[in-house]
């Protein structure tokens, strides 16, 4: 690799940041060893003679081979960093030029669609919001060049719904996104987004989510709308335990309780729950102080 002055790479990054295509092309043409048009991730590094038994190599040969490998790794690193900068800065003009020059739209294991959808992949990988540059325009360009909208286990649609970006959700669905996959443990940030989920269902998108968990969270949140929605979607009410509905009782949510009754929840399971507990103050009040059960229940509900 030719030695690359730091200021050359910096100049290229500045052109990317401004989406200055003319300056970018001039810099790239004047520095041909920086190649952003291929996909280093899919190339094999030529280790040359390093494949042969190490004892047959002379010291000078080893140093030369190590330097050659280092040069290739540095080339790949610079190329990868600069290409990622194009995505992070939403540099649509430059990205279009790179695609036209042969850069695969799925470079870097679909780095572009992954970052464009979520805007944040880690401390060093996040979208920089610049005036006149937006991720929706970037997503349109990626789709125009044939990006897989269901890449990385349906991550794009998941990220768009998660970030509450309906324009992206709509664009992805219109271009073939067909599964919303919510992994176990992530329902907490999704169960209440029923408007987006309704839109997806109306447009034939498969919802791959733990509905019973979503129902539990809806009950816990005391949300009538969400409870009804997930019951209608087929959430298994038998997965709800007696302890899960205590909050509805405590908050006097009559509508929610009736919804559960109408959908087959067995409230007599509360009797078993109470019977399994050790002696408590309520047992003493009822059995030893002769307090009326109904009166005690009214008092508890009033001041709970």
Swiss-Prot record:
Keywords: ANK repeat, Repeat. ANK repeats lie at residues 7-36, 77-107, 122-151, 152-181, 183-209, 210-239, 265-293. PROSITE patterns: ANK_REP_REGION, ANK_REPEAT. InterPro entries: Ankyrin_rpt, Ankyrin_rpt-contain_sf, Multifunctional_regulatory. This is Putative ankyrin repeat protein R598. It comes from Acanthamoeba polyphaga mimivirus.
